[in-house]
Amino acid sequence: MISLDTLSLFLSINENDLVEELVMTLLASPQLAVFFEKFPVLKNVLTRDLPRHKADILQQLKSTAVPPLLEAEFQRFQQYQALSLRDFNAGLPDLLAWLAHQASPFNEKAQALIANNDTQQCNSAQQTLFLQRWRLSLTLQTLTLNQQLLDKEREKLLAELQQRLAMSGQLAPVLADDDEAAAGRLWDLTRGELQRDDYQLIVQYGDFLASQPELLKLAQRLGRSREAKPVPSDDAPAEIFHQPVREPASVPEEVNGLHQSDDILRLLPPELATLGISELEIEFYRRLVEKRLLTYRLQGESWHDHITQRPVAHQHHDPQQRGPFIVCVDTSGSMGGFNERCAKAFCLALLKVALAEKRRCYIMLFAHQVISYELTAGDGISQAIRFLSQRFRGGTDLAACLEAVLVKLSDVQWHDADAVVLSDFIAQRLPDALITRVRTHQEQQRQRFHAVAMSDHGKPGIMRIFNHIWRFDTGLKSRLLRRWKR
């Protein structure tokens, strides 16, 4: 069986040019032009994705089999092309009969070429002309087949792109904003068969998230919690240190008190009086020599730099790699209602952070069993829809969830992940062995565990094992206070 790609190769048909023309026609279609005008970011994303679509179409051409009649005619053409003139003339009647029997598009032209020859025999030039016209007929048939297949692929691809563009246009304000990188990752998540009603569930929770801005801020703070930290440097050299020092100046500026000196110009009146008494004159001169006369002290102040060298402890910032999110969501009955909506909206907010920062987001629902969804996989939107469709009506088995998290963190791909537990933490006490294992991961592997507490009534003993506790109380009083502060 000959593939369409092989037949095109034998007939020197350039399929790459055909595919390139199809793509250019597709991009110029009015349906896509409307989307590109409304969402310009998606045009760049789609352009980036074009090589993959071209490769898929070329692969489709390679895997498409040639119709049996066309394959048989091509094999007959190859057979007659290799014949000598005598053998060609000998087999010509059988060939004409075969073309007529197969209703070949070349039959009419072949009969006309031979009808012009009275002897029903061909010379060398007529043989060459016959084979050229036959090859041209085969080429036209192959081009027609290629075009039919490409038209079918174009319609299929156009329908797929329209669906994905419509979905991305609806979800971009919820999960990507105007971030082109996030929009590109969102585009990658939209593969799969989804109807409009399916992804409207994400839009609804996106609207709810917009009405609870504190949830989005909490997710962003949690995502930024692994910032670069200052680390002291041990090999810091000594540096020159400048310190301003104030010292008295000899320049007279103001009276600053009394002192003993030999300054005649600033003598106090009692000292001058002793000079006029003959009995005390010798005492005056003795005190003058000893600089013990009471005088006014006039002085100012001056500042200068005191330069010293001392060792300075330098610090450099050690960037902390931001790994994936592993989010454990409590689906017990106490997490139903408003708590359930907040939990799902918070997971969407974390997905938004993950798309913007090129991180993975893995959701684990824990009740009586653990159910997992990876929202950043190739079918992430489909998995997100299945997650949002879940109902929180189970029990609380936090220990089983943490066991599953520890197993996931042991995987090399998830070694740098941040584990986030979303619950009201109204649960049974954790086993001591599990607490020890969590502590070991925190201390030896430097892995971080976050608790998002959705109630003020959670058990403190359970939450002590977490590195960070983020509180979002969903009680009526807290909801009213948050609404009043907006």
UniProtKB/Swiss-Prot annotation:
Q: Name one GO cellular component term.
A: cytosol
Q: Per the UniProt entry, what species is this protein from, by scientific name? A: Erwinia tasmaniensis (strain DSM 17950 / CFBP 7177 / CIP 109463 / NCPPB 4357 / Et1/99)
Describe the protein's quaternary organization and the partners it interacts with: Homodimer. Interacts with RavA.
Taxonomy, superkingdom: Bacteria
Q: What InterPro entries does this protein's entry cite?
A: Uncharacterised_ViaA (IPR023481), VWF_A (IPR002035), vWFA_dom_sf (IPR036465)
Q: What is its main location?
A: cytoplasm
Q: Which family does it belong to?
A: Belongs to the ViaA family.
Report the function annotation for this chain: Component of the RavA-ViaA chaperone complex, which may act on the membrane to optimize the function of some of the respiratory chains. ViaA stimulates the ATPase activity of RavA.
Among HAMAP family, the record links this protein to: ViaA
- Gene3D superfamilies given for it? von Willebrand factor, type A domain
What NCBIfam families does UniProt report for this protein, alphabetically?
PRK10997.1 (NF008230)
Q: Would the keyword Chaperone turn up in this protein's UniProt record?
A: yes
Where does the record place it? Cytoplasm
Alphabetically sorted, this entry's keywords are: Chaperone, Cytoplasm
Name of this protein: Regulatory protein ViaA
